[in-house]
Amino acid sequence: YAIDMGPWSFIHGEAAREGGEDCLVSARGLKTPRAGLSISMGNPHTVVMLGSDGKLDGLDLHSLPQVNPAPVNGTNVEFVVPVDLDVESGAQVGAIRMRVHERGVGETLSCGTGACAAAAATRFWGGEEAPDEWLVHVPGGTLAVTFVLGPDDLEHVVLAGPAQMVATVVLR
């Protein structure tokens, strides 16, 4: 299943584009604050790149990460680590592992808009050579994220992944 999630954008505009970061993020399990990049997918996200799986796995995301400056209405915070891929077809595909703290909820197993924001930030950091297709590995499974030109001439994000019927409900 796939859906066009719409265009992505920088929350802090040109300053984020020029510097590649727009805030500092503190979280339990990190010794020092890390640079983050705030991305809008229609809702706010702040993405932080970490250097190793150990750092990602060592985070305690039961507590709200602190973002300074934070977007006005708060933000979901995604922590990512790059993943090496062996792609036999020769197609260029990026891959990251992600964990997310969703505002008002805490850590969740997956977040569709978060996966899109994380791929957008990682792709931005990768520069012009970064791929348009990404695999985002979250605790709940793997999602595919693709960047395409939308009908409005903006860059849109297409999210794809498995779907499973979990209940049938009859309302009366």
Task: Give residue spans per PLM region.
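Active-site proximal loop and beta-alpha junction motif in alpha/beta enzyme cores
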Residues: Y1-S110, A119-R172
